[in-house]
A protein has these predicted regions:
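Hydrophobic alpha-helical membrane segments
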Residues: 1-307
């Protein structure tokens, strides 16, 4: 019986199949590689996309975080050095058996330093989010920005970013009176204030209103994103600073230096991660409510040809 006809250059049936590569999404016209396609995103898309921002531009992202975050972390470590040095296992046991538990022995830092740390960390996050918004928005528009350009934009918009942060946290404080959970409402409404300040070039008050307008129609989804980011941030933070906490508990010398270094190292990862989610969430909301993906595609399609 004659063999079945086989088309020229065809693959034999028993030939092994080669795996199909799945490249990362790239912007049209050979632009920068994107962390996630510009489309409606799920919470896993936002979390994974934020990590991909760090992978795609580690020098720029970590450089921005280092310039903004490292001085703050070292300052806070030095400010709290005595309380950190006193927070060790031996002191805790001595006070427990003597009945004289002190604030220093139990690692209490006092209300003042703690409040200052919260404010400075919040301002750092706002400024880093502004810088990342400029970087990532540029990618989706087909433009690559240098580390120097990102840092300049972040600090140029630092004043409105700081004022917007204060406005948001005043609202959170008002909502939290008598009910801690109430702070989640403004935290959700104003989750994309920093990206709005930089991407749209608007002032703090307009950015607060703009964020509220974008998030209000998807309150549940944005709240879920906020809670997911908080959970991941807490888990990663504990993992990254765990060794430093053990070092402090053992009462070894130079505990405040180790604590400051661990906090600074954790900030280089966690701050860009949280900021990156805020940036991608801002883009997601604009895609859903305003068709940002269609607008950018039309701009590229009908852009005038270069002379």
């Amino acid at each position: 019986m004659a063999d079945a006809w086989v088309a020229p250059d065809s693959r034999p049936e028993d030939a092994p199949r080669q795996p199909v590569a799945t490249p990362r999404p790239a912007a049209p016209s050979g632009g920068p590689v994107l962390p996630v396609p510009l489309r409606p995103m799920t919470i896993p898309d936002l979390l994974d996309g934020s990590l991909r921002i760090l992978k795609l531009a580690p020098r720029t992202v970590i450089g921005l975080a280092a310039v903004v975050s490292l001085p703050v972390q070292l300052f806070l470590g030095y400010l709290n050095r005595q309380a950190i040095e006193d927070a060790n296992v031996a002191a805790a046991f001595d006070d427990a058996f003597s009945g004289n538990a002190s604030t220093e022995a139990t690692g209490g830092l006092g209300a003042g330093p703690v409040a200052l740390g919260v404010v400075l960390d919040g301002l750092v996050l706002a400024i880093v989010a502004g810088g990342l918004a400029y970087l990532v928005a540029g990618w989706y528009a087909g433009t690559e920005h240098s580390l120097g350009a990102v840092i300049r934009v972040a600090f140029r918009r630092a004043a409105p970013l700081a004022v917007a942060w204060v406005l948001v946290h005043l609202a959170e404080a008002v909502f939290a009176i008598g009910l801690i959970v109430g702070a989640l409402v403004p935290m959700t409404w104003f989750a994309v204030v920093s990206p709005a300040v930089v991407c749209e070039g608007i002032g703090p008050w307009r950015a607060v209103r703009r964020s509220g307008a974008l998030t209000r129609r998807r309150f549940g989804a944005v709240l879920g994103t906020v809670l997911a980011v908080a959970l991941v941030d807490a888990l990663l933070g504990s993992a990254l600073t765990g060794l430093a906490e053990v070092y402090v508990a053992l009462g070894l010398p130079g505990a405040w230096v180790v604590t400051a270094a661990a906090g600074a190292a954790a900030g280089l990862v966690l701050t860009p991660f949280v900021a990156g989610v805020a940036v991608l969430l801002y883009l997601d909301l604009r895609v859903r409510h305003e068709g940002l993906d269609i607008e950018l595609a039309a701009n590229r399609r009908f852009a005038p040809a270069p002379a």
